Amino acid sequence: MAPKPNSDVTTKRWWEEYHRCRGVLVKQLRTEKGWTEAELAKRATVSIQWLRALEGNRLKSNHRMQHEMQVISALGFGTYEIKDFIGRVEDMVKETLGPPPWLKPAQADTSERPSK
């Protein structure tokens, strides 16, 4: 039995995929620029270990959002362009899982009803 569209399980799975895709996109953008992990870490003023954890989806829940923003900024996304980065991550997740479960309409009862 598949989880309901708006269940805690599907919401958790969506966010797990979001965080995975975020790391994939950071790594993709870094390699497109021809930068090593060390170079991006230096530009973003974060440790190489932290950057590796971001790219490998191994950040703990207490990671600092400031570090994440420093990395995104170092990749060329300004304050007003961060939504573009987030949009790209969301598009990657939608390709895998579809839209966020909290945006999916409730599953309608599709059983056929007898006609009168």
Task: Identify the meaning behind each predicted range.
Residues 34, 42, 57-73:
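Short, basic-rich loop-to-helix N-cap that marks the start of a DNA-contacting helix
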